[in-house]
Every structure is written in structure tokens, then in C-alpha cells.
Amino acid sequence: MLDVVKVLSDLISFPSVNDPVRGVKPSYDIVKYIYEFLSSYGIEVNVLESNGYYSVFGSVGSGEPYVMLLAHYDVVPVDASRWSYDPFKPTLVNGRLYGRGALDDKSNVAAMMVSLVELSRLRLNRKVLFAFTGDEEVGGEYGALHILNKLVSEASLPKYLINGDGANHVVICRRRKIFEVVIEVPKEFEVVRGRKGIKTFSAYYPVSQHAHAAYFIPSVDSHPLICASILIKELGAYVTSIEGKFLKSNVIPSTVTVEYVVPEALGDEVRVDLGLTKLIKAVSTLVRTPIPVKAFSEFGISITPNTYVSDAYKHTLVLDVRAMTTKELLYQAFNEVVNELIPEAKIYVRTDVGGFVNTPKNSRLVKVFTEVLNNLGVKYSVGEGAGASDSRFFTPYNVEVVDFGAVGGGMHGDDEYVDVESLKTLPKIYSEVVKKLLS
């Protein structure tokens, strides 16, 4: 079998960063490398483009499409000053290969590339599709979704999807769907008498540091905006302003500062915002909105208020919601709460066309995966992933999906790495799973 460590090292050396804020997209160089690598072994491969993002797409075998391998080569931005090693110079230390994308997700790209070479040498009675995309870190619309639409239009959907976008040998068969609930409240000013106050709250994670909405634990972690909401309710105060480190809808703000006025008959006259006051008071109730679900999740329902902005006329709060539910059920639940607390508010729900992932543990795909891992002596678990992946685009079409990946650490953080022994086993895992599914 080919040297997967060498292939991954080559992939890491391409700085395929996706950073829309700075207008940075992955360069074509890594696409060319993947294309030429696969082509050199006689594999049928094409490059697809959508909105400036490139996907390497092709197949091995013959007959009807049956199994698909999927992974992404784009990576998140990096602060090189915080790394012990050059993030784009693969560095092998104590059995770990360091580099941006070593775990997420170039280890899977490399493993699948090597696996495809082996599979291409066999007489496969059904077709194995593959795709390596360049926009997973920014939503997947121009990569996985673009390819899905192509497959749907050609009536070429596979029965099974193996998405190499997991980690630590977890056979991920469940993932919640992600929504953004947008609440707009008009500004409404009034002068009141009272005592001014100001309070800054910080996010606190006593168990694990993350700042990602997918990993927020409501009964353990402390969200600064929720704390501010409870303070205002308990004081019976009016809000004059809210400021904070509001970055993205899926990132917990590190700090939130609330300026308020506690009513006092002999206090100073202060102009307050009644609309903002209602909105902030509502936060601590909104995050407990009872949402009907369609399937079990070990993470339950996560609701975090992570983005706030205002303009001349209104305040806008965006809640990150993760649940095994539908857009319609979610809207009904939040609309009931908003109508009760802030009847003048407007509410919208944003989401993509993907669904939640809920492949049964007794499905053929999961069973085959676990059989292969057992046969290879690989320690594993079967469970749920907290975040989203491109698998979600395929589930509405009844494609059985699982996510998987090698052992490693530092995903989206500093000193990202993959365990080399785990990496070396990965191509064999993918090859054996595909062969068993085709048998």
C-alpha cells in the first residue's frame, strides 16, 4: 500500500486556508496535486468548480453508484505565532504528525486517496464515487451540496456515504441539525429615574475550553449573555446598552458588558431602551424554549445567543440552535415564546437544506464499519458528533451515512496533529469497509 504519511505530508504543505473574512480561498495547487495523483493511477477523476471553489470528483469500479467516499481539503485559518511548529511544514514528533489540517481533514483525504488506488485495482461490481471538496469549513454549499445536486440530477445517488470528517475512531452515526433563530426588536426609548450600573460577564468552561456553540454544556458552562439576562431580570433593571465579543453565530462571546439602570424614585434621569430591555430579559427564557424533536440526541438541545447587533431602528439577536428537529417545529416553538415575551418582535429561522443525521446503530453501514474495526483490532466507539458535517446534505435523500476519522488533537486550534499509527491504519479501514459493502 502507498505511504499515506507521505501523501498527508504533501497535502499539509499546501496552505489551503478558507477565510471569507479576508477573501481567502484554497489555492488550486492542492486540487492539482490530488487530481494528478489519482490520474497517475488511471482513476477516473474530474475537477468541478462552483463560485470559485473546486472539488475533485470521480469514481472507481463499474455499474451503478453504490458507495461514496467524501472528505475536504480546506482548513481553518491559523495563527502561526501560537504554534510550536510551522503549521504548513509537516513535522513528525513522537509519533505525531503536526500541521494545519493534519486531523481536520487532510488525514482523511490522504487515507481515501490511498484507499482509492487499492480499490481501483480490483474488479468492483458496483461504482464507488469519491469527492474531495474545498468549502466544508465555510458551509459546504459549493462543494458537497454542489456535488449532491449533480448526483440527484443524474439519478446517481449512492446507497452509502462514508464521510471522512470525524476523529478519534468514533463511528459517528448521529448529528443534530443547525439553525439560526433571528429575533428583531424595535428600539423604544424612555427616560426613567434610577441608579446606573455596569457589569461585565465572561464565558466560563470549567471542564473543557472550546467557545464553540456545538460543545456548550448548559448545566456546566457559563454564557455571558445569559448571565446578563438573569442579572437584569433579578434587578428589575432597564438596559441602556449591550456590548460584547460577538464574532459569529456559532462562537460563544468571550465577554458581554451590560449597562443598566435600577429604578429609584430619587435617582438620576436616564434614557433607557425598553425594546433592548425586553430582548435581554427574554434571553434566559429563550434558551430554555421547549422544542419538539424527531429523534434522540445524547447532546439534547443546544440554544446559545451568540450574536447581537443594532442599527438606527432595531436590535437583532441571533440564537444558534442545534436539535434533531425541523425548521417548522422550531419556528412554532420559538414563535410561541417570543409572542408571549416580546409580541412586537419579528422572528425568522435560517437553516440550510441539509437534515439531521440519524443512521441507526443496527444499520448495515454501521455494522460493517464495526466488523472491520474489530477485525483490524482497532479500538473505537459508536456515537454522536457535536458539530455539523457535509453528511447532512445527503440524509434527506435517505442515503445511509457515517463520519469517521483518525486519532489526533488540536482540531481548529494550535499544534494540530494526527497520530501516525492511527493514520497508517485508516486507508485499510476505508478499503475494507467499501469491499464489505460491495460484497
Indicate residue ranges for each PLM-predicted region.
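Zn-dependent metallopeptidase/amidohydrolase metal-coordination segment
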Residues: 249, 308-322, 348-353, 367-437
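Short glycine/serine- and small hydrophobic-enriched flexible loop segments
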Residues: 114-121, 229-234, 432-435
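Acidic/histidine-rich catalytic neighborhood of metal-dependent amide-processing enzymes
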Residues: 106-188
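Acidic/His- and Gly-rich active-site-bordering loop/insert found
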Residues: 1-100, 119-126
